[in-house]
Amino acid sequence: MMSLGLVGRKVGMTRIFTAEGDSIPVTVLDVSDNRVTQIKTVETDGYTAVQVAFGSRRASRVTKPLAGHLAKAGVEAGEILKEFRIDAAKAAELSNGAVVGVDLFEVGQKVDVQGVSIGKGYAGTIKRYNFSSGRATHGNSRSHNVPGSIGMAQDPGRVFPGKRMTGHMGDETVTVQNLEIARIDAERKLLLVKGAIPGAKGGKVFVTPAVKTKGAK
């Protein structure tokens, strides 16, 4: 069963210092204005979940069906809608229009962060898969950065699916697991997560409690 999480915006990276003077690299996430737009139950939808809106959007950019959906909940239109599967007991504590804040997490807690990685365009195998390049000289005239053989002979006579070749790199959903929350700024509604997370500055991310915590029995 999934847990309730937060939708956020990647502000950027910085570092903080511990009381002992150690430097910790952190990613700053803005998780303000997470508001509940719908509570789904087994009776009405066949499963239990909560739908959350994040950010803001001009009324002229909202479709009529979505505008009606948000008006029913009494919630301002958001930049993004995200659904989290939760148990019935947790859903009973929430209501439409309720704000989900940084108090959902605590310092030291492990979380999973999902985002969209930075797109790199069409890339070769050296950049995309860390292949080694060919020899610069000594008989190598036109095969410095080629991937090499991509198959066998007449049998099987084809390239196997999944062969690592050149192609589009980045711009895909990536989840980084077991990141630690180093600090919480409740006043500015910021989460400072230890380490790097996918995506560019301003990118949308989803933060949820870790599901595979290291060392857990």
Curated annotation (Swiss-Prot):
UniProt modification remark: Methylated by PrmB.
GO biological process: translation
Keywords of this entry: Methylation, Ribonucleoprotein, Ribosomal protein, RNA-binding, rRNA-binding
Keyword Ribonucleoprotein: yes
PANTHER family: 50S RIBOSOMAL PROTEIN L3, LARGE RIBOSOMAL SUBUNIT PROTEIN UL3C
Subunit-structure text: Part of the 50S ribosomal subunit. Forms a cluster with proteins L14 and L19.
Name under which the protein is recorded: Large ribosomal subunit protein uL3
The organism of origin for this protein: Burkholderia lata (strain ATCC 17760 / DSM 23089 / LMG 22485 / NCIMB 9086 / R18194 / 383)
Recorded name of the encoding gene: rplC
